[in-house]
Amino acid sequence: MTNDRPLFIPVILGTTRQGRMSAPAAKLLCDEIGKRPNVATELIDIAQVPLPVDDAGQAIKDPSYAEKMNRADALVIVSPEYNHAYSGLLKHVLDSCLEEYIHKAVGIVGVSAGVFGGTRGIQGLLPVMRELGLVDIFWDVNISSVQDVFDDSGNLKDPSFLPRIDKFLKELIWMAKTLRYGRENIAAE
């Protein structure tokens, strides 16, 4: 069976800090996804997701965010690495949904000012992805020394990242198609 409905793969910008260097990376991923045939995307900036911080879980679910997660076939999470971890507010937003994520692909882009390209933050996110029911792909994109990768206008200065992003997106799209077929055609038990 084929499904002609375009895949929907939103990109989640996983930080709210001022001057965040993850924003150009998230925009780049949106641009690259947008070049793919039969794939739609949207940037989801967690700074724009209105969630209270004095409660947690599905009780605080934002209807717009939940609808996008329900519609998504896969996700790209662009996460900076802060002190060997991911953003606490990213976790807060992710935890606001549960069933919306089940059996959907996820790819993670790590961003850092240091040499590890967000690897430690990605490692911290992987068990969270599993607990949420997301299926992580085996390719990551690691953007190290992010301050040297994008210019002051947020444009990519280092085209060597494009083949990595291409490989990452090919795997994510394959997994998204496979999991969508399963969700739509195979009963979960």
Please describe what each predicted stretch is.
Residues 106-146, 159-163:
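Short, glycine-/small-residue-rich phosphate/pyrophosphate-handling segment
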Residues 13, 18, 87, 106-109, ...:
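Short glycine-rich loop/turn motifs that provide flexible caps or phosphate-binding loops at active sites
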Residues 1-99, 156-189:
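N-terminal beta1-alpha1-beta2 submodule of the flavodoxin-like/Rossmannoid cofactor-binding fold
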Residues 102-103:
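His-Asp phosphorelay/catalytic-motif detector in bacterial-type signaling
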Residues 42-53, 99, 132-152:
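Mobile beta-alpha loop/short-helix "lid" or hinge segments that flank ligand
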